[in-house]
Amino acid sequence: MNLIDLILIAIYVIGISGLIFNKNNIINILIISELNLGTLGMLFVLASVELNDILGELSGLYILTFTAAESAIGLAIVVILYSKTGIINIRHLNKLKG
């Protein structure tokens, strides 16, 4: 385990703690989840380079694609929530029903 791996693991732990302590703002939750998935993708790529295996790189690419889709859907929900309520708060998501 080298220094880059330790830095990425530290960033991932910071992101998890951000999810634990921040539960109200949707934008922050989206940014933290992007950070976590990005670091996981980088860890997969670094592991595949160290092991000389292509599956880690393919997994990193899959995670990157999933992250982009999650970001687009999340931002669409934020735009709809803001246009209906004028507030970006996770507690107001129930106002999007029907």
UniProtKB/Swiss-Prot annotation:
It is found in: Mitochondrion membrane. It comes from the Eukaryota. The chain crosses the membrane at residues 1-21, 26-46, 61-81. InterPro entries: NADH_UbQ_OxRdtase_chain4L/K, NUOK/Mnh_C1-like. Keywords: Electron transport, Membrane, Mitochondrion, NAD, Respiratory chain, Translocase, Transmembrane, Transmembrane helix, Transport, Ubiquinone. Its EC number is 7.1.1.2. The keyword NAD applies. It is an enzyme of class 7 (translocase). It catalyses: a ubiquinone + NADH + 5 H(+)(in) = a ubiquinol + NAD(+) + 4 H(+)(out). Disulfide bonds: none annotated. GO terms for molecular function: NADH dehydrogenase (ubiquinone) activity. One of its GO terms (cellular component) is mitochondrial membrane. GO terms for biological process: ATP synthesis coupled electron transport. It is a multi-pass membrane protein. It holds the Pfam family Oxidored_q2. PANTHER family: NADH-UBIQUINONE OXIDOREDUCTASE CHAIN 4L, NADH-UBIQUINONE OXIDOREDUCTASE SUBUNIT ND4L. Core subunit of the mitochondrial membrane respiratory chain NADH dehydrogenase (Complex I) that is believed to belong to the minimal assembly required for catalysis. Complex I functions in the transfer of electrons from NADH to the respiratory chain. The immediate electron acceptor for the enzyme is believed to be ubiquinone. Belongs to the complex I subunit 4L family. This is NADH-ubiquinone oxidoreductase chain 4L. It comes from Dictyostelium discoideum (Social amoeba).
